[in-house]
Amino acid sequence: MSGFDRRSFLKASMVTAAATALAACASSERATGTTPKAAGKSVMGLVVPKMDEVRVGLIGVGERGIGFVHHFSRIEGARITAICDTDTLVLARAEKAINEYGRDKPAYFSKGDHAYRDLLNRDDVDIVVIATPWAWHHPMAKEAMLAGKHAFVEVPMAGTIEELWDLVDTAELTQRNCMMMENVCYGRDELMVLNMVRQGLFGELLHGEAAYIHELRWQMKEIDRKTGSWRTAYHAKYNGNLYPTHGLGPVAQYMNINRGDRLDYLTSVSSPSLGRAAYAKREFPADHQRNQLKYIGGDMNTSLIKTVKGRSIMVQHDTTTPRPYSRHNLIQGTNGVFAGFPNRIALENGGSGSYHEWDENMDAWYAKYDHPLWTRMGKEAEENGGHGGMDFLMCWRMIYCLRNGEALDQDVYDGAAWSAVFPLSVASVGDRGNSKDFPDFTRGVWQTAKPLGIVG
């Protein structure tokens, strides 16, 4: 048997064995909230063999994915070896960028919706970065792991509880990373607050507030290409929090969710759905497809989460109403509070002298509590861009961990728990706000897992 044939045989054998084991995990259990039997061992704190060079395959290089072309082309120890996108225009843009960096020419794939499978079959791809429309996140991440690759997927990780369990099971079975790339966890402010929390500045944590408040009605004008061409339909199909992780991810890390505490249940309600129909009526002809949709998603959704330890988290979603951008980023403890947008802090023994007034002068707080990772890499991150540097820092950290044999900062359990707010909020809104339980995606490991440390 030739080397190529042997590799193909082993890969096919792995996929067959994995499919058989995953089939044994009853889909009915995944869907109903019963914890399914594990198909493999936990990947909490998973460390994989060090990689001298991390060979990157990119699936999706459009509005979001083109940033990854730039970031991985600039990071030492990373090499883009394959790129796939069904849109030849954005593929050509990615090729132009690669050439400008003077990097080795990667393989390109663009023929059909499943061309990404040609990328997955390559032996020169170690990790697969998925930046595609949401519906493709689950199947692509699963197939990447079954092909022996580590999967790095854009937010949200998947759209249903069953899909989230499927990714957890696949990661455990294959012993591959499946990281949902929540970039906001790498923002300067979020890292600073994480540092503050770990140093006990706020005392015992009680409550957090998170949000994705970002007016995006203009995306409705993207009909055939770009994000609005597929994202708009979600507002006509679901009533809940469509996009919870940007705000929730950092707050969950502050609270050591999945590492000493976990999300227990949520209750969710939505406001009336008025803004998108009004926008469509104002901006499009009466017979336009945007005016044919029945928008059911409330303009503002508010979900309240209770953790097993009794803490509370408010998570809001609004991409429709005219208001300033916010992720809230609030964390309240027994000794004080930090709130973002704009940044401010109040402590019982804080610098302002009174917790009845906000201290909005953050310079001194940055000087004392800037996260060591930002202190080390912040200047380079800002120079390379991506939402103020958080995107570059996230990519740098991914490569650093893989090259140095360290566990990633986010794992499949984090991505599953944070993404679960979407389907659970939809279920709660549809049930008059009655509470819905979060699955324990860790299968109890959260009780003994080490807290996420301060990494530099």
From Swiss-Prot:
Cofactor requirement: NAD(+)
Organism superkingdom: Bacteria
List of residues binding substrate: Y212, R231, Y243, P244, T245, H246, Y325
Gene Ontology MF terms in the entry: hydrolase activity, acting on glycosyl bonds; nucleotide binding
Keywords: Glycosidase, Hydrolase, NAD, Signal
Range of residues in the leader sequence: 1-33
Enzyme Commission no: 3.2.1.-
Protein modification: Predicted to be exported by the Tat system. The position of the signal peptide cleavage has not been experimentally proven.
NAD found in the keyword field: yes
Cofactor binding summary note: Binds 1 NAD(+) per subunit. The NAD(+) cannot dissociate.
Family, per entry: Belongs to the Gfo/Idh/MocA family. Glycosyl hydrolase 109 subfamily.
Name the UniProt record assigns to this protein: Glycosyl hydrolase family 109 protein 2
Organism: Shewanella sp. (strain MR-7)
Phylogenetic placement of the source organism: Bacteria, Pseudomonadati, Pseudomonadota, Gammaproteobacteria, Alteromonadales
